[in-house]
């Protein structure tokens, strides 16, 4: 049967999804399942790895059944995933030794402090491009080894395997035959030298992590193994892997130096491709791995905002100001401005460029005249302000002043937010016709690996822009608003 489709598995923080793309990069069908979040104590976030696998595998089976597409028509499966989230399992039984520790989890802060005390901060920065922060996988691995009974001994005997979620899914899909990751995911572990593209022995020693735990690192665009849907039928190639943000960067075809995208999800993640040069940030950004025009390793600057769409969830779930996230555009548009109100959503600290884990959220500028509409508008504007923080830092680090910003993620359907983003950055904001760019990136990688598409040049004709938002306020007004935001952030950090 002719190979007509590519499937992307998009394993996220709150749900697992499977999406079928045809040769024109149109979405044919989507399947999605949510899974529970586990919060054992304040600042701790976990997932059950078996629930991740169950949700992801069931979406794949359901996707093909619902669409009527036979597995033999699928050219390849690509995988994109929440990054940094850490799983350790028994390599014989496949049973996890502990729940997956999620990227948001802060439990390993003390390990980061210990590494700083050992004088490793600069070495980590130079080698991995990252900061010493519990966000990344390395300290999560060490926490499991040190705190779960018997795990360190088993790891040192070579009985256990570590993986980020991509590695876990490939291992399960191949029935334990393949233990692999790609450079984009490896670069988020705190253990990977982004210059040599190798695991770093000094960092492994510092964290006391056996190298036998670690997966083999293969290119993002490659055939890793084969899988059978529900263990039946012919085999399908697993042929592309990228961490979610690098996958979105590739899906937006930001494959040349100076191109950037911002993903509006639970958090916001802004990445700029810096080509063959690993730019060292002096403004609070991360240096990470990206994917180039020929699927080769490129580098990128990355800024992460912890509270993007999660801020809107807070308005809905904790304050009860809205019933649905889509309501925010209506309420925000009912007022001309926020009447001086700023919301700094530092509920779990502040990410780039501040990196202050002790900052806490604040609602600044409230008066007797402040109402629900002002607060809702301030919440949306906060997402755009934080993205402006990242863009300014990138301009200082790279010397590149962006003229266009590509956007994706759930919140880009909010026209108010997109227009305000253009206004506050003085940059054109381009919204794609297909906003599933994270999944599209994985599909592109898989399709290129097996020859379903010939090159990224062919793909450029498949990424249409649905709307461009043009800056519409004066430079003076923009500066006035942004100065107010900076004052609010300063108060938050001081408090």
From Swiss-Prot:
Sequence positions that bind ATP: 13-15, 266, 309, 313, 410
Pathway info: Polyol metabolism; glycerol degradation via glycerol kinase pathway; sn-glycerol 3-phosphate from glycerol: step 1/1
CDD domains for this protein: FGGY_EcGK_like (cd07786)
Residues annotated for sn-glycerol 3-phosphate binding in this entry: 13, 83-84, 135, 244
Superkingdom: Bacteria
Keywords annotated in UniProt: ATP-binding, Glycerol metabolism, Kinase, Nucleotide-binding, Transferase
Name of the protein in question: Glycerol kinase
The organism of origin for this protein: Shewanella sediminis (strain HAW-EB3)
The gene coding this protein: glpK
